[in-house]
């Protein structure tokens, strides 16, 4: 396998997807208050054999306020990544997993997540801000 980049995504798939709106009253309440919902992202990885890594990218769209009535939306998206043999430095590996892989998979992940939100009765939802994973990484590093 020849890699022109420092990594290759061997597979990507939805590991878990969830939409929860308990009842019609909650749905009506959420429909009026969906603008308060926030998108949160978490990225975890675990090593597999043969320089492969499983990267789990989780998106949650949720209300941070303490309302009793709320909907909950979550997706866990997995990428199986083969890292080039030359990558030895932990920092380089972090950049690959937290920035490069994310930038590559995000269009599919975002589309799948938006489909979930739209099909859950919220067709007006748009994720206005594109996530800049490189910028996020730089902020966390400082």
What is each of the regions a protein language model found here?
Residues 1-142:
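N-terminal intrinsically disordered, cationic/polar leader segments
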